[in-house]
């Protein structure tokens, strides 16, 4: 059995998958915020419960935000303060007496989608998350590409390209990002960025679901906003696709639930690509909230 953990700032979610990659059981508990020992106990207790339930010693994979293993073997995860700065992989491997694998949560999302029964035909899969922020991951021949610092796929921290500034206006504000830079695309393409763009142009503080509801009702202002957003997304994604050239792009995060993102994006891409380039297949993520657990479990299928 394959145990996949999706660990965030508020919850630790465990999913148990069989050899056919089907979810058999899941459980969630709150993430301890202050005590590393309590954090380790929470993970180990879930593993012990799964071992008892299924009568086996399952393999363990963990998806967690941040840098799973720095050069000195410690975790960097600002959203999981109890474990950040600790040698999490080594400590869990020792306590559980098995090889524990860690990866970035965005890589686990991409891995989950790449191992979808239909999508395994593609050698290079790109996951793109349009949620609270913008991120993603790259999967090549069923394995995540992490890079030495685990920042492969941090698409949200690319800067706005020149074509975007031409489209939006040269006086378009380059917003300061949480990373310390200015003009990172996640400030405009995330769910929060989607709402910020609307307020910037129309001076109305609406949230993304409200704007989308107006769009669905045929509101002209909301429709103009979505057109502008999709054009901006196409410009930025075109740069990424020119570098990566994937077979498939799978879009996740809250904005992936808005059908226009996946149905209208492809037609906007050709003018931002090289003439010889082919637009990849673009799909909405298929595994929803289970994707993080699923991808973490499948870290043991990448040998």
Curated annotation (Swiss-Prot):
Keywords in UniProt for this one?
ATP-binding, Carbohydrate metabolism, Kinase, Metal-binding, Nucleotide-binding, Transferase, Zinc
Pfam family name, one: ROK
The top EC class is: transferase
Named in its record, the pathway it takes part in is: Cell wall biogenesis; peptidoglycan recycling
GO BP: N-acetylglucosamine metabolic process; peptidoglycan turnover
Q: Which reaction does it catalyse?
A: N-acetyl-D-glucosamine + ATP = N-acetyl-D-glucosamine 6-phosphate + ADP + H(+)
The enzyme's E.C. designation: 2.7.1.59
Q: Which InterPro entries match?
A: ATPase_NBD, N-acetyl-D-glucosamine_kinase, ROK, ROK_cs
Q: List ligand-binding residues for ATP.
A: 4-11, 133-140
Q: Which GO terms describe its molecular function?
A: ATP binding; N-acetylglucosamine kinase activity; zinc ion binding
Annotated positions binding Zn(2+): 157, 177, 179, 184
Q: Gene3D superfamilies given for it?
A: 3.30.420.40
Q: Which domain of life is it from?
A: Bacteria
Annotated PANTHER family: N-ACETYL-D-GLUCOSAMINE KINASE, ROK (REPRESSOR, ORF, KINASE) FAMILY
Write out the function statement from the record.
Catalyzes the phosphorylation of N-acetyl-D-glucosamine (GlcNAc) derived from cell-wall degradation, yielding GlcNAc-6-P.
Family, per the entry?
Belongs to the ROK (NagC/XylR) family. NagK subfamily.
This protein's name: N-acetyl-D-glucosamine kinase
- Species for this entry: Escherichia coli O127:H6 (strain E2348/69 / EPEC)
Q: What is the lineage of its organism?
A: Bacteria, Pseudomonadati, Pseudomonadota, Gammaproteobacteria, Enterobacterales
């Amino acid at each position: 059995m394959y145990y996949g953990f999706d660990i965030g700032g508020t919850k630790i979610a465990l999913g148990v998958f069989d050899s056919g990659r089907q979810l058999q059981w899941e459980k969630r508990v709150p993430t301890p915020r202050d005590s590393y020992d309590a954090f380790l106990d929470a993970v180990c207790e879930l593993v012990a419960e799964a071992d008892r339930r299924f009568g086996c010693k399952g393999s363990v994979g963990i998806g967690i935000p941040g840098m799973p293993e720095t050069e000195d073997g410690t975790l960097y995860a600002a959203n999981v303060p109890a474990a950040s700065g600790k040698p999490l992989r080594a400590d869990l491997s020792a306590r559980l007496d098995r090889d524990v694998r860690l990866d970035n949560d965005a890589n686990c999302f991409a891995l989950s989608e790449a191992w979808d029964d239909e999508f395994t035909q593609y050698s290079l899969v790109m996951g793109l998350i349009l949620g609270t922020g913008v991120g993603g991951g790259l999967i090549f021949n069923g394995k995540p590409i992490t890079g030495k610092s685990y920042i492969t796929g941090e698409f949200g921290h690319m800067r706005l390209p020149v074509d975007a500034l031409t489209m939006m206006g040269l006086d378009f504000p380059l917003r300061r990002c949480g990373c310390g830079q200015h003009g990172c695309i996640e400030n405009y393409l995330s769910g929060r960025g989607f709402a910020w763009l609307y307020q910037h142009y129309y001076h109305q503080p609406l949230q993304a679901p409200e704007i989308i509801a107006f769009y669905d009702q045929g509101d002209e202002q909301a429709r103009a906003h979505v057109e502008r957003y999709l054009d901006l997304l196409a410009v930025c994604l075109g740069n990424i696709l020119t570098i990566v050239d994937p077979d498939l792009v799978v879009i996740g995060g809250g904005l992936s639930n808005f059908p226009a993102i996946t149905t209208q994006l492809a037609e906007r891409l050709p003018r931002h690509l090289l003439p010889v380039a082919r637009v990849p297949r673009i799909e909405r993520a298929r595994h929803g909230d289970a994707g993080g657990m699923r991808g973490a479990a499948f870290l043991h299928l990448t040998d």
